[in-house]
Swiss-Prot record:
Disulfide bonds: none annotated. The Tol-Pal system is composed of five core proteins: the inner membrane proteins TolA, TolQ and TolR, the periplasmic protein TolB and the outer membrane protein Pal. They form a network linking the inner and outer membranes and the peptidoglycan layer. InterPro entries: 6-blade_b-propeller_TolB-like (IPR011042), PD40 (IPR011659), Tol-Pal_TolB (IPR014167), TolB_N (IPR007195). The gene is tolB. Residues 1-21 form the signal peptide. The keyword Cell division applies. This is Tol-Pal system protein TolB. It is found in: Periplasm. NCBIfam families: propeller_TolB. Its main location: periplasm. The lineage of its organism: Bacteria, Pseudomonadati, Pseudomonadota, Gammaproteobacteria, Enterobacterales.
Amino acid sequence: MKQALRVAVSFFMLWAAVLHAEVRIEITQGVDSARPIGVVPFQWAGPGAAPEDIGGIVAADLRNSGKFNPLDRSRLPQQPGTAQEVQPAAWSALGIDAVVVGQVTPSPDGDYNVTYQLVDTGGAPGTVLAQNTYKVNKKWLRYAGHTASDEVFEKLTGIKGAFRTRIAYVVQTNGGQFPYELRVSDYDGYNQFTVHRSPQPLMSPAWTPDGSKLAYVTFESGRSALVIQTLSNGAVRQVASFPRHNGAPAFSPDGSKLAFALSKTGSLNLYVMDVGSGQIRQVTDGRSNNTEPTWFPDSQNLAFTSDQAGRPQVYKVNVNGGTPQRITWEGSQNQDADVSSDGKTMVMVSSAGGQQHIAKQDLVTGGVQVLSSTFLDETPSLAPNGTMVIYSSSQGMGSVLNLVSTDGRFKARLPATDGQVKSPAWSPYL
């Protein structure tokens, strides 16, 4: 935990946060069918009000995953502060088989000790399933809450938690000298800061696998160009600025390659650059449009959008050569896919019956499930553990970000108050 906090602190110490109206989650569909769990407000052992609602952070994280339905605070049968105070029978009577309790205690040096316990109230009543204590300063209290969420989530599901991750996205503000901004925030919209401002459009942010850099498209030179920016010091390196279109960057999971789309020869095709040498080679050819690459976990195969059959569909191709294979067949068109880190599923924009929604496809069975119910949905991006999807949709005259769990149980909106928000990209584990 201490190492994780040091990494996070160094990440932000090198970037002074720029204050904006932050993107915050508003629930649009709950998770009544998910696993019930108790999350008790953490006891505050200091004077006045608690500096942060850690219990609320943990409950929100678990709810956002779609896998848990935290019991409403008004229905809690008791509010214990420690594992010893938990009365298992009171919880099991409500169908709750696990309860999170915790404490926040100020330390003499001005920091805070955040402690949690995950208590079994079902199979082995009273057993502590997981526990930890973190010492953090006030700025990192939310991070401590997300860390507790990650540990609780993994203990109960066997899936690594992704609540300490971040999202990058583009905001178009109303007027000003630099109306386009590339921003980064925690996955839930808190701790937002600006990476880059521009008088011209910014598009398609993509994270390096270690989370230290972002690739994106800029038009500041008068035409599209692909750049990579280091988050720790702001250094920008241009990697592609060919005639016509340069876009849709995507780093391979092993970090050795960057895929993108170019139209320098007329048709829009996929290319792959060796990150170390800068050498670029063409992957697709022909007169069709081939774009929006996303990597499979082997760092050798790409899923991408192509209109070679008339309408956009998702295909798979090996970057070392071979014939692309179509992998989407349901709906009138499918595009802008994102493959999960285990390679078993992908999310995409799927159109059918005049509707454009986010859908999930099982890459083994081919089964498709529509996840979203918003309007003109686009640019889905998966959490690194594959449990949540962030995407943009149209609302009124603008665009907002939305969150949906990959089982479709939980849906939320992240409304922006100072501009249109689009092109979200979920970070790797940080």
